[in-house]
From Swiss-Prot:
It holds the Pfam family Ribosomal_L13. This is Large ribosomal subunit protein uL13. This protein is one of the early assembly proteins of the 50S ribosomal subunit, although it is not seen to bind rRNA by itself. It is important during the early stages of 50S assembly. CDD domains: Ribosomal_L13. One of its GO terms (biological process) is translation. It comes from Treponema pallidum (strain Nichols).
Length: 142
């Protein structure tokens, strides 16, 4: 019996809706990354874009346990000497509410061209309103 490989053009893609309100950041990000990769499908192929589209709402209401909201730091570097910038989770959520979740999901995806394609398939919104109603996303729990 031969192994059947599904082509990227033949892959059936669904839309999923995840409400992140009151859920841990890592659990939501892990579920989103799994759906983006397509690991929940029998036709999973690690080198192809086989995953589904994911819409995440209420990203600003995601939480971290303990003292992590003030202790967890996000770093970036300008490329110049002394150009290391850091911001805490709580400060980042106030300024850019979707960024911590996007950053966590991106870290769970493959690095390289496939990961850059996959991160475009997730749509993250701070509130509960999103413009993807016409795609009829299926609500999921994490």
């Amino acid at each position: 019996m031969r192994t059947i490989f599904v082509n990227e053009r033949e892959a059936v893609r669904a839309w999923h809706l995840i409400d992140a309100a009151g859920r841990p950041l890592g659990r939501v990000a892990a579920r989103v990354a799994c759906l983006l990769r397509g690991k929940h499908k029998a036709s999973y192929t690690p080198n192809q874009e086989m995953g589904d589209y994911v819409v995440v709402i209420n990203a600003e209401k995601v939480f971290l346990s303990g003292t992590k909201p003030k202790d967890k730091m996000y770093y970036r570097h300008s490329g110049y000497p002394g150009g290391l910038k850091s911001v805490s989770f709580s400060a980042l959520v106030k300024r850019r509410p979707v960024e911590p979740l996007r950053h966590a999901v991106k870290g769970m995806l493959p690095k390289g061209p496939l990961g850059r394609k996959l991160i475009k398939n997730v749509k993250i919104y701070a509130g509960s309103v999103h413009p993807h109603e016409s795609q009829n996303p299926v609500p999921l729990s994490c």
